[in-house]
Amino acid sequence: MNVQIGIDLMGGDHSPLVIWEVLIDVLNSRASNSHISFTAFASHEVKEQILSHSTYKGYPEVIASESFITMEDSPLSAIRKKSSSMALGLDYLKEDKIDALISTGNTAALITLSRTKIPMFPTVRRPALLVRVPTMRGCAVILDVGANVSVNPEEMLGFARMGLAYKQCLGDTEHPTVGLLNIGSEERKGTEAHRLTFRLLRETFQHAFLGNIESGDVFSGSVDVVVSDGFTGNIFLKTAEGVFDFLSHILGDKLESDVKRQLDYTIYPGSMVCGLSKLVIKCHGKACGRSLFNGISGSIDLVRARVCERILSSLS
């Protein structure tokens, strides 16, 4: 299967040349596979820097943009930058010139532009950011982790459907379960929206819904899919990442390699903008080389798994 991956080099916390070098590392690691190719999107200046210094002159292809989106740009200003590197990448995705787009840039801008350019699944009201996190039993899927600050119960139900479909695509469990991230396990816990969502999930999924789950229990692997609003989910995710980084720094070499590998969230691809008919991956703006490497490599695997088509099929 031929796979064409697009990557926006602009707008992240790292230099575009750092992202480019990671892209070259991925190419080198898959040198024997001629069915994988990349298209990068960058400013004219960055393209010139790449062409003047890279040993891969002209390959991967670099598409020059008139502008790029910064972390300070609002969604509205991002829309106005019609020739930004991010917008060009999404245009290529819309026109099937690439199979997936990866960005380390402005999350709100990426989601807004994606919604304006890429069709959503017919039954989904809002996209959600979906990530995988390590657990004692493998990995769990959690969504939303930042696309929507507030959502209603019907939208949370849509997140649960997409999360279950995604988990089934991974092939590590035949009958995935779902839980609702909340401040307690009891049914009455949380806001009115949480209580309504609890009842809706129970009515819809019955035995597959295991009730509320507290943040500390996510890593036990007691549920396969964790549903959350984007505000709570984002705080959970960044806290978890911070704890891992803290432990890695404090314990250093004392942390056994197999334990470190089990805790390491960077082995998984970045956040998938779930709900779109095409694959868009958001890597953390501060992502290190390894995290970016795995985000790019993971996107190749998701394309080959036809994850968007399979989620759509499950929602039909």
Curated annotation (Swiss-Prot):
Location(s), subcellular: Cytoplasm
Protein keywords: Cytoplasm, Lipid biosynthesis, Lipid metabolism, Phospholipid biosynthesis, Phospholipid metabolism, Transferase
Major location category of this protein: cytoplasm
Subunit structure: Homodimer. Probably interacts with PlsY.
A biological-process GO annotation: phospholipid biosynthetic process
PANTHER family with a match to the protein in the record: FATTY ACID/PHOSPHOLIPID SYNTHESIS PROTEIN PLSX, PHOSPHATE ACYLTRANSFERASE
Reactions catalysed according to its record: a fatty acyl-[ACP] + phosphate = an acyl phosphate + holo-[ACP]
InterPro entries: FA_synthesis, Phospholipid_synth_PlsX-like
SUPFAM superfamilies per UniProt: Isocitrate/Isopropylmalate dehydrogenase-like
Name of this chain's protein: Phosphate acyltransferase
Gene Ontology, cellular component aspect: cytoplasm
Catalytic class of the enzyme: transferase
Documented EC number(s): 2.3.1.274
Originating species: Chlamydia abortus (strain DSM 27085 / S26/3) (Chlamydophila abortus)
A molecular-function term among this protein's GO annotations: phosphate:acyl-[acyl carrier protein] acyltransferase activity
Family: Belongs to the PlsX family.
Listed Pfam families: FA_synthesis
